[in-house]
Amino acid sequence: LEVASVGRSLGDDVAKALLERHPELQDSFLPEIGSIVSAACLAHDLGNPPFGHSGEKAISTFFSEGKGVRLKEKQPNGEQLSPMEWEDLIHFEGNANAFRILTHQFEGRRKGGFVLTYTTLASIVKYPFSSSLAGTKSKFGFFVSEEESFRKIATELGLILLNEHPLKYARHPLVYLVEAADDICYQMMDIEDAYKLKILTTEETKELLMAYFSEERQEHLRKTFLIVNDVNEQIAYLRSSVIGLLIRECTRVFLDHEQEILSGTFEGSLIKRIAERPAAAYKHSVEVSINKIYRSRDVLDVELAGFRIISTLLELMIDAVTLSLIHISEPT
């Protein structure tokens, strides 16, 4: 919900500025950007498995190195996964799974999946290419089963086709705002959660958050803390202030690079182009998250448990299906 709220703020701020810059578009869909980005933010993590990124890794590893390897071979009923389908499994991606959930007509359900607008659907696809282009980071936007659905959406919206085989498009412009909302919120939530779990001390947390601001702004914040002396309230105030700053910075970057974004030549994310001081503070926050939060004993214990749980569930479900196929294929 917080990502959706930040996404709406980003979308509204960008829309307001674009309408001032392009008043001839007053009657277009531009005023709805905030709602579109907010909806995309709510939907974009829908396909993530339990345990988040470690869950994705568990699924990929099960097929690439675990007991799921046997599914690469021809099955008792004569069926065999295509090379592209196998790539989808060994590079399992939550974003691609979200696109599938939102668009696929599952058994007994109405046609069109969740029936979202094409613009909303395109706005969740951060990596608009197939799994064969995923590389070492295992990032891609749609499974081979939904490739034609994405092609239809991309054609209708006029997304720039970069490569036909394997399929690759330039991002929809609003993807950058969805990604920015995600980058902002999850980094701030990681810091706040680490504070609540006592992984970070009060002083460490304050230092991380204060670093985003100029000396003048820091002095103003210190004066505020003389009035608001509850430590938890101070952390919450700092956190919301940083989020506001990052929203303004990402909005500025989007507007400064409007033509590059529209032409499909903009590289990287908005958060990587923000001003020097907040960029340095954000980078330091990421480093602290990696070194002190993601590698903490509690987090690693949960990830290890998740790895075992997902592997066990996959094995049980696949055994149920393959044993059924063997039974069906046996002569009577």
Feature names for model-found ranges:
Residues 1-39, 46-238, 247:
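Sequence-structural signature of the catalytic-core scaffold of metal-dependent phosphohydrolases
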Residues 2, 176, 180-183, 242, ...:
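Charged, amphipathic alpha-helical oligomerization/scaffolding segments
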Residues 13-18, 66, 254-257, 317-320:
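Solvent-exposed amphipathic alpha-helical surface segments
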Residues 169-176, 231-242, 270, 294-305:
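Non-transmembrane, amphipathic alpha-helical segments
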Residues 224-272:
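Long, amphipathic alpha-helical stalk/connector segments used for oligomerization, subunit docking
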Residues 255-325:
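Substrate-recognition/cap regions that form aromatic- and gly/pro-loop-enriched pockets
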Residues 326-332:
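Residue-level detector of conserved catalytic or cofactor/ligand-binding positions
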